[in-house]
Design a protein with these regions (language model features):
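A short C-terminal helix-loop "cap" of Rossmann-like NAD(P)-dependent dehydrogenase/epimerase domains
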Residues: 51-59, 153-172, 228-242, 267, ...
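Non-catalytic, hydrophobic alpha-helical segments
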Residues: 257, 261, 276, 286-289, ...
Length: 350
């Protein structure tokens, strides 16, 4: 019998990668996406172009223009289908934007996740539920790490336990400044774990680093690499916010993250949580990214520097993915930072 997957945020970066990946594995896909990214970040961030491509390419993809906060609409979909897999990626993804409309941010990220979890529990309890969380659940605690300033990046002191592999899941999510986005995602993160641990359901929470890939509709407030490449390609001014442009992020390609989902789906666990980023394998500072993209595109970046950093922004963040690799030893990265940048620049989605 054909397997069935429900994917929220199905036209977004991780959602659309999930649609492609699982459609090509033979799943029937029910996608939920109401292009709220356009509301958050403006016309340039709309995902409608991506949704159109998916509908044209995959006959086993059915799209629903539904708001995840609307329990009646979500319940109707769950009553119509028995799902084997649920991938919940729909979100308000920017910590800057969250401060403008806290109610919208919280209802989308926390309430919307609760709507999904409760319908999963009631109607498809045998399914595997995967949630895309964020490293922002750790708040600004990573900024307390002992950092060294190098020429183009900040780096962790070599004698620190996190130096070799990055930050693991044991870092506290308490007593820190999260941003309102980090707080709403923390609520959803813990809820997803709780539905696994309390109700005994198969849930996996993936705390993403910087998620990226050629399908990213980059905007100033979200999608750092895609937006930076876009600015350099079209000659638009890019703004660096604080830390001298030396802040470091680990970047994971959308394919590598969705491949994590695939491995988890095949051998699911209950109430599990994983850090999911590029780790030591794939990380970069803003200054390093500018230099690399300039070389790929053969164009000089036009950028300005603002001394004030974004509230709660990480100076250095690299995810330790050792726990996932231990649980799923057959999984590994297929993309490094140079592959990611080359693909974004060659996608032409500017």
């Amino acid at each position: 019998m054909t397997k069935k997957a429900l994917i929220t945020g199905s036209a977004g970066l991780i959602g659309s990668e999930s649609v492609r990946f699982f459609a090509e594995k033979g799943f029937d896909i029910i996608g939920i996406d109401n292009d709220m990214r356009k509301y958050f970040f403006g016309k340039e961030a709309s995902t409608e172009w991506n949704n159109k491509l998916l509908k044209e390419k995959y006959k086993n993809y059915t799209h629903h223009n539904v708001d995840i906060r609307n329990n009646d609409d979500i319940e109707r979909i769950f009553k119509e289908h028995k799902f084997d897999l649920i991938i919940h990626t729909a979100a308000q993804p920017s910590h800057d934007w969250a401060a403008k409309e806290p109610f919208t941010d919280f209802t989308v990220n926390a309430n919307g996740t609760l709507v999904m979890l409760e319908n999963f529990r009631k109607y498809s309890p045998e399914a595997v539920f995967i949630f895309t969380s964020t490293n922002k659940v750790y708040g600004d605690t990573p900024n307390l790490l002992p950092l060294v300033e190098l020429k183009k990046r900040y780096e962790l002191k070599k004698n620190h336990p996190y130096y070799k592999n990055g930050i693991d899941e044991m870092m506290s999510i308490d007593n820190s400044k999260h941003s309102l986005f980090g707080a709403s995602k923390s609520a959803a993160d813990i809820l997803t774990q709780e539905y696994g641990k309390y109700f005994g359901l198969k849930t996996g929470t993936f705390r993403g680093g910087c998620l990226t890939g050629p399908q990213h509709s980059g905007a100033q407030l979200h999608g750092f690499l895609a937006y930076l490449a876009k600015c350099i390609a079209i000659g638009k001014k890019y703004t660096i916010f604080g830390y001298k442009g030396k802040q470091v992020r680990d970047n994971i390609h959308s394919y590598d993250l969705v491949n994590m989902f695939w491995h988890f789906y095949q051998k699911p666990r209950r109430g599990e949580v994983y850090n999911a980023g590029g780790s030591r394998h794939s990380n970069i500072s803003i200054l390093e990214a500018i230099e690399k993209i300039e070389n790929i595109l053969g164009k000089k970046a036009n950028y300005e520097y603002v001394d004030e950093n974004r509230i709660g922004d990480h100076i250095w963040y690299i995810s330790d993915v050792s726990k996932f690799k231990k649980h799923f030893p057959k999984w590994d990265f297929e993309y490094g930072i140079d592959d990611i940048l080359k693909e974004i620049c060659e996608s032409g989605h500017f």
